[in-house]
């Protein structure tokens, strides 16, 4: 093997839901170059979402070549590749031709809803939760895979004969990059399939039987940081993690009680629970994360449905702001929300309420309420919902939140970050490096090949750009939060449905 000292770069491949990206990092974990290409979204029916796996591979290969060319680098200068990916998205391909037998079924796709309903009717819901840490929902790969095997003629038989392979996007990319030599996944991606026992760390025989999935088609499961194989040009592939777990690692949340929140359209919260697979009483997912060396650790995961989308609503539907960045200015013009609470339950409420029948509402309106107050209430709602999830995680895990690391587009909003710290009563840490997902994949690959020697070396590179300290006293904080809880309670069970009074 060429001396690692002569190779001064790591490439992170960030395969997302709408685009494929390549980010080149140097030894100081600085971004040298980025390349990105979008690809086609296919919507064959209402609620169905597909991608073409060949287009995903083509765009991901192209951006890697593009990034190297832009940076003026040769592949010999790259120590390793780390891969992070949209999770749960499901691909089945022919082992000989390397061609998919059907489009990739994307994590957002709801076509396997009826399969999930049948699993519930058959009494499997508790077993699924106990074994896989997941809820019975079309979100996860298992029912998507069953749908393909049920609907593509002869596919189940071919899979039993060892002719077909299954993988999440990481597996598919590695298979293609290694020229069909390597069929692997990592523990974080396996834990999102609904086929994997997160306690024994093996594919679960009963789940395979329930969903009628042939064992022969499944990838080998490995840690998130080791050398899995090499590309045709000889670059080692050394790190794999699902996107949210990669962000958790990129934020250096590797010890129990450390948590990160990604503020996007919704919010993704993950809290590391160390070597304990904590069972949630609040509908959180129990999932696998990356330990200090990329080994198995556990995490609780919760999602807020409407984060940045609440601000988009102010802009696109209400038209009271021209740009999302304006919200910080308007929110700062008033000293508080004047008693206004906005509960953005546009599509129901997620964790910890899980009420699909809740609907959005604006409370506390008086003649003294101005547009500024409503804009401020919209930003505050993102912070309140984050506290809802983090409070539940702390109750489930018994871990006290040390500090909240943040990433995603909305973290540039200083008002939101300060209010988040205030309402949590906990320090919020905003990193200088915003590419935390790609950085996590780069770290995992770098540790695997000796590019970086230890976690301590990486910690030294994690620069916090700004710390937001809580400034509200306990009484004021809890009074505000009690108002939020009251507002949420009034939105519950709004939409008429069977079983409602």
Curated annotation (Swiss-Prot):
EC code: 2.7.1.30
Pathway named in the protein's UniProt entry: Polyol metabolism; glycerol degradation via glycerol kinase pathway; sn-glycerol 3-phosphate from glycerol: step 1/1
CDD domains: FGGY_EcGK_like
Alphabetized SUPFAM superfamilies for the sequence: Actin-like ATPase domain (SSF53067)
Keyword Nucleus: no
Gene3D superfamilies reported for this sequence: 3.30.420.40
InterPro entries reported in the protein's UniProt record: ATPase_NBD (IPR043129), Carb_kinase_FGGY (IPR000577), Carb_kinase_FGGY_CS (IPR018483), FGGY_C (IPR018485), FGGY_N (IPR018484), Glycerol_kin (IPR005999)
MF (Gene Ontology): ATP binding; glycerol kinase activity
Residues given in the record as sn-glycerol 3-phosphate binding sites: 17, 87-88, 139, 243
PANTHER family per UniProt: GLYCEROL KINASE (PTHR10196:SF69), SUGAR KINASE (PTHR10196)
Function summary: Key enzyme in the regulation of glycerol uptake and metabolism. Catalyzes the phosphorylation of glycerol to yield sn-glycerol 3-phosphate.
Name of the protein: Glycerol kinase
Chain's gene name: glpK
